[in-house]
C-alpha cells in the first residue's frame, strides 16, 4: 500500500506544506479518489477553482488530471474565491466542487476544500478518501477537462438580490488574497465607492497575512478609516469565505456580533427561524435571537459541521466565531465572506450613520481565543478528564457538545480540543472584568488539577 502523508488529512479539509507533505503527485492521487467517489454517487463532473497561491496552478492541474483519470469531467473555473467555487457547483449543475486553497495558512501551504454530491467532506469522509487512494480502490476512465467562467454569473446573482438603500464609501482590504479577483467589481456594482487595500492577488501576501480574525491584520483598515471619509471597513481572508468588519472609529465587530445583526434582519422575514452558532460565540447571542423571534441552536465548531447542521435543520442562517457565515435565506447555505459583506452593507445602508447599527449591538468583556499547546492527542485526553473530574463552583450549566463550555450567572468559560492542531482552545466572557478574572481562575485551577504541569496561557 502506497501511503499518503497522514498529517495533511485534517478534520474539515486537506492541507499541507507544498513540495513536502503536499505534492502534485499526492494531489493527483487524491483527485483520482475524489473522481471515483463522485462517479460512484452518479456525479459526472467536478468544478475546480483555486485561490491566488503561487502553487495553485500546478496543484489544480494535478487535481484535474486525477479527476479525469476516474472518468469524471473536470470543469476548470480558474482563480476565484472559494465561495465562487461552491457557487459553481450550483450554477453548472454538477453538485460537486473542489477549491484548491490554503485559506489563511502561510504562503508555503495549500490544500483542498471539497464538496461531493452537495455534501462537504469532513472528518471520516476525508479519512475515507485517504484510505481509498492508498488501497487503489479507484475507477478508471478518461474524463474530459473543460474551462468555464462563473465569476460574472456569481456577481450578477448577488447584485440582483441585494439592494443598498444608499451608496456607501467603504475601505476594502483583500490582503492580496483571491477575494481581490471579485470583490472590487462586486461591491462597485452594488453601488459602493471603494478605498481599496491590497486587492491585487499575490500569493506571497507581501503586505499582511490575509486573516481578519487577528486584530493586527486589520490595522491598515483602521488607519485608512481614520485618514479618509469612508464609513465602514471590510476585510476578507485568503480564500474569501470569511469576513472582517471595522467601524469608522476603529472598533472591530467580531463575527458573533455580526451574526446578531444578520439574525435580526433574517428573522424579520423568517419569524421562528432557527439560528445556528458555534460554541465559541458570545452568550449574548441566544437571548438576542429569542428577543427577535428566533430559536437559537448552539453547535460544534467547524465550517463543514455547521454547514451540515444547516442543511439538516433547514435553518435560514448560521455563523461561527471564526468568521464563516452561512446564509440559506436568499442564498445557497455555504460560507461566503463576499456575500456576507454584501448583506452587511445592505443593512447598514438603511441608516444615515452606517456604523450605528453595529455600535448598538450588545457587548461584554471577553478574551480572544487562547491556545494551550500540547502534544498530539493530549488535548482530547485533557478535555475528557475535565468533563469527568473538573470542578466549577457556581456554574449553572455544563455544555459538552464540543469540548466543555461552563455557563455561570455572569459569564462563561470554554475549553475545546482543536480538530486541526494539537491545542486546547480557550475562550472566556463575563459581565465585567472581575467576573472574567474569576472564571479564568476557575478554569486554571480545574485544568492544572486534572493535568498537573501544563502551561495555561492566561
Predicted regions located by residue number:
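Proline/glycine-rich low-complexity loops and linkers
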Residues: 84, 127-156, 160, 248-321, ...
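Phosphate-binding and adjacent anionic-ligand microenvironments
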Residues: 270-427, 432-458
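An N-terminal, well-structured beta->alpha segment
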Residues: 1-65, 69-70, 147-168
Amino acid at each position: 500500500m502506497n501511503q499518503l502523508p497522514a498529517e495533511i488529512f485534517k478534520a474539515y479539509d486537506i492541507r499541507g506544506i507544498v513540495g513536502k507533505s503536499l505534492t502534485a503527485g499526492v494531489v493527483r492521487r487524491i483527485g483520482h479518489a475524489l473522481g471515483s467517489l463522485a462517479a460512484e454517487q452518479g456525479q459526472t463532473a467536478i468544478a475546480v477553482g483555486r485561490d491566488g497561491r503561487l502553487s495553485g496552478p500546478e496543484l489544480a492541474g494535478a487535481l484535474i488530471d486525477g479527476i479525469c483519470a476516474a472518468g469524471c469531467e473536470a470543469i476548470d473555473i480558474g482563480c476565484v474565491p472559494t465561495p465562487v467555487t461552491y457557487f459553481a457547483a450550483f450554477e453548472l449543475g454538477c453538485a460537486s466542487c473542489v477549491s484548491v486553497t490554503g485559506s489563511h495558512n502561510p504562503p508555503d501551504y495549500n490544500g483542498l476544500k471539497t464538496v461531493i454530491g452537495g455534501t462537504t467532506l469532513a472528518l471520516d469522509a476525508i479519512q475515507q478518501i485517504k484510505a481509498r487512494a492508498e488501497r487503489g480502490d479507484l475507477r478508471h476512465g478518461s474524463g474530459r477537462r473543460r474551462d468555464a467562467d462563473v465569476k460574472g454569473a456569481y456577481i450578477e446573482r448577488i447584485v440582483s438580490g441585494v439592494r443598498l438603500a444608499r451608496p456607501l464609501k467603504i475601505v476594502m482590504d483583500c490582503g492580496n488574497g483571491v477575494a481581490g479577483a471579485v470583490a472590487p467589481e462586486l461591491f462597485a456594482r452594488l453601488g459602493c465607492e471603494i478605498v481599496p487595500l491590497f486587492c491585487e492577488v499575490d500569493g506571497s501576501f507581501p503586505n499582511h497575512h490575509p486573516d481578519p480574525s487577528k486584530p493586527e491584520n486589520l490595522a491598515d483598515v483602521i488607519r485608512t478609516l481614520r485618514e479618509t471619509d469612508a464609513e465602514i471597513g471590510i476585510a476578507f481572508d485568503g480564500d474569501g469565505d470569511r469576513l472582517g468588519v471595522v467601524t469608522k472609529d476603529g472598533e472591530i465587530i467580531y463575527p458573533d456580533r455580526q451574526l446578531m445583526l444578520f439574525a435580526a434582519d433574517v428573522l424579520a422575514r423568517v419569524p421562528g427561524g432557527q439560528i445556528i452558532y458555534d460554541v465559541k460565540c458570545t452568550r449574548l447571542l441566544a437571548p438576542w435571537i429569542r428577543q427577535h423571534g428566533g430559536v437559537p441552536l448552539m453547535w460544534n465548531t467547524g465550517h463543514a459541521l455547521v454547514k451540515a447542521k444547516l442543511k439538516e435543520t433547514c435553518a435560514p442562517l448560521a455563523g461561527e466565531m471564526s468568521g464563516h457565515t452561512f446564509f440559506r435565506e436568499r442564498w445557497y447555505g455555504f460560507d461566503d465572506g463576499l456575500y456576507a459583506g454584501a448583506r452587511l452593507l445592505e443593512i447598514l445602508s438603511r441608516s444615515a450613520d452606517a456604523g450605528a447599527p453595529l455600535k448598538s449591538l450588545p457587548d461584554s468583556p471577553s478574551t480572544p481565543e487562547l491556545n494551550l499547546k500540547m502534544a498530539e492527542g493530549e488535548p482530547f485526553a485533557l478535555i475528557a478528564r475535565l468533563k469527568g473530574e473538573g470542578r466549577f463552583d457556581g456554574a449553572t450549566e455544563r455544555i459538552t457538545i464540543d469540548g466543555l463550555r461552563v455557563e455561570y450567572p455572569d459569564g462563561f468559560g470554554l475549553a475545546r480540543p482543536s480538530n486541526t492542531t494539537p491545542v486546547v482552545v480557550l475562550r472566556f466572557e463575563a459581565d465585567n472584568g472581575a467576573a472574567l478574572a474569576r472564571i479564568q481562575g476557575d478554569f486554571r485551577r480545574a485544568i492544572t488539577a486534572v493535568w498537573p504541569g501544563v502551561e495555561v496561557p492566561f
